[in-house]
A protein has these predicted regions:
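Signal peptide-proximal N-terminal region
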Residues: 58-59, 86-94
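Periplasmic-binding protein-like
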Residues: 167-170, 232-237, 243, 277-302
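Short, low-complexity disordered leader/linker segments with a strong preference
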Residues: 1-63, 389-390
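Mature extracytoplasmic/periplasmic domains
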Residues: 292, 296, 301-362
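A ligand-binding cleft/hinge motif common to bilobed small-molecule-binding domains
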Residues: 131-133, 260-280
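Conserved C-terminal helix/tail region of periplasmic/extracytoplasmic solute-binding proteins
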Residues: 40, 47-48, 252, 356-390
Length: 390
């Protein structure tokens, strides 16, 4: 811009300012009322975390059903476990043959490979030795629950085909109204006073509980899991003298006096003691010369008609809620140590369990030992003992 242009611009500005100064002042106006101060915005509530099982729950509910097998409602508090699961997720339960043994469960899968109806089990709860054999035969499928890392490595398949659920030790459940002198150890059961009173909880050719009872007696008499002949000889003698009752013992047969001395897992016997509430009076004895602990395992059938419901069932069982429901039934849930470490076991539940020193002598047979024991007993029970348990 030239100096002349700058000069003219300045003159014009001065002229405008002079005229403005001569104009009358505008009437004063009131300041507008201040708008009310808005309350500071509250931070939005954090969104509830998404349920990591939401998709599985939806898929399971779409299937609508779950078929179980060999889950007596008076075993390990399974009645409450089943009802809680069904009510929580709205899934109908089809409960097959509650009194079946582990071998029967495996046969049910084999017999219903092509059956998507109500006779085909979705899930099984079997003795430890049955898990690996079922995997080898292609009868079960892998699935790792959310709490997988808190299940001890020694009782689970690394690929997730089967995993331990709970354990207990073998005990005598004795109806004191029918038995005057309560037996305290394995040798006592051969005494003449117990004629027609002693029973197993299943057929030793198919029942894991009965097989381990023979293993316990074998150890008490100098045998081994690999060679439990001493256990078979013991039952052969018991059968010979008439003390053995070839009836599958149940709570009802104990109460009626048909099998007043029965060999059960401690958690079943303790549960019966509470349930009978003195009518009849039940005494639970853990024989000191052969304390055998047994672990059961869960698995999903490779042919499950309701695979998502089966997976949700597993998630429920291995959640804190499911594990504590089992504890109410006197079993030691497989995640017990994790629950205890986090302080989530209610005091009243902990106090109901037998003293820990009772379990100090407990022997946990390895998978290989259980497999050897099962094979020996299944092959030799009939020819050595000769009793048809049913």
């Amino acid at each position: 811009m030239s100096k002349l242009h700058i000069y003219v611009s300045v003159v014009l500005l001065l002229l405008v300012a002079s005229l403005a100064g001569c104009a009358p002042a505008p009437a004063p106006t009131q300041a507008p009322a201040a708008a009310p101060t808005a309350a500071p915005a509250q931070p939005a509530a954090p969104a509830a975390p998404a349920d990591p099982l939401a998709d599985l729950i939806k898929a399971a509910q779409a299937e609508g059903e779950l078929t179980t097998i060999a889950l007596p409602r008076d075993w390990a508090n399974y009645g409450e476990v089943l009802d809680t699961f069904s009510k929580k997720y709205g899934i109908k339960l089809n409960e097959l043959d509650p009194n079946a043994g582990s071998g029967d469960e495996i046969q049910a899968i084999k017999a219903n490979k092509d059956n998507k109806g109500p006779q085909a089990p979705d899930v099984i709860d079997v003795g430890l030795s049955f898990g690996p054999s079922a995997k080898a035969e292609g009868l079960i499928q892998p699935y790792k629950v959310s709490t997988w890392d808190t299940i001890p490595d020694t009782v689970k398949d690394p690929e997730g085909y089967w995993y331990g659920d709970y354990y207990g030790v073998l005990a005598f459940e004795v109806n004191k109204d029918a038995v005057k002198n309560v037996p305290q150890d394995w040798p006592d059961l051969l005494k003449p006073e117990y004629k027609g009173q002693v029973a197993l909880s299943g057929d030793p050719r198919t029942s894991n509980q009965a097989i381990l009872a023979i293993g316990a007696v074998a150890l008490a008499n100098g045998g081994t899991f690999a060679n439990p002949q001493a256990g078979l000889d013991y039952f052969a003698e018991m059968n010979k003298v008439g003390n053995f009752v070839p009836v599958i013992a149940k709570p009802g047969t104990v109460a009626s006096g048909e099998t007043p001395i029965s060999m059960f897992w401690d958690y079943l016997a303790l549960g019966d003691r509470d349930k009978f509430a003195g009518n009849p009076t039940i005494e639970v004895v853990i024989p000191p010369s052969g304390v055998i602990a047994g672990v059961y395992v869960q698995a999903i059938s490779a042919y499950a008609p309701h695979p998502n419901a089966a997976k949700l069932w597993m998630e429920f069982l291995y959640s804190d809620e499911g594990q504590l429901l089992w504890l109410k039934g006197y079993v030691h849930p497989i995640r017990y140590n994790d629950l205890a470490a986090r302080g989530v076991i209610p005091a009243d539940l902990a106090e109901k369990m037998p003293p820990a020193d009772i379990y100090a002598k407990a022997i946990f047979p390895t998978l290989e030992e259980q497999t050897a024991l099962k094979e020996y007993v299944v092959a030799n029970w009939e020819k050595v003992v000769g009793a048809e348990v049913k």
